[in-house]
């Protein structure tokens, strides 16, 4: 892990509980089995790059040898033109754009986060999903509210039923991502 960090001094934030003064982070390896989860002191963080900032980095980079997942992100940008909610790539595409280190493969999927502290109208959620659902490789869209995260696909397929809500301390089933508060047993201090 130390060798990997010396080669690529970037980590990703993990949505997990962390001790006071620490942030849960992940170190990427060359393969999924070479990933490591740990904690970093908040004071050790030198730069924070939000997913929505990465769209700008993509637009200013040269397109010489973009992998299929990066090309897929360009298609999503076209299809979501005008979306005012902050959004951007996470996962391997986000890591690659933020760090400059090649980690995507032709088979990597595209993970996207949409920040939605306010309720997204169901018709907007459907429209966003319909614009990307047939793209390949697969596009996984996670919506992040102020309390939890959830899969856009699950939300649009079952808008009036319970869905899996992800909290920093774990997941549980709920029916209102914007109204649910983390239960005491899952609350992060």
Go through each PLM region and give its residues.
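Polyanionic, low-complexity intrinsically disordered segments
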Residues: 179-180, 185-188
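Short, solvent-exposed amphipathic alpha-helical segments in soluble enzyme
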Residues: 104, 128-131, 158
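Conserved catalytic core of two-metal-ion nucleotidyltransferases
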Residues: 133-170
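Helical scaffold of the NTase/Pol beta-like nucleotidyltransferase catalytic core
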Residues: 1-92, 125, 129-137, 141
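Active-site nucleotide-donor binding segment shared across nucleotidyl transfer reactions
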Residues: 77-110, 114-120
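Mature, function-bearing regions of proteins
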Residues: 43-50, 162-179
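Short, charged/polar "capping" segments at the starts of alpha-helices
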Residues: 121-123, 150
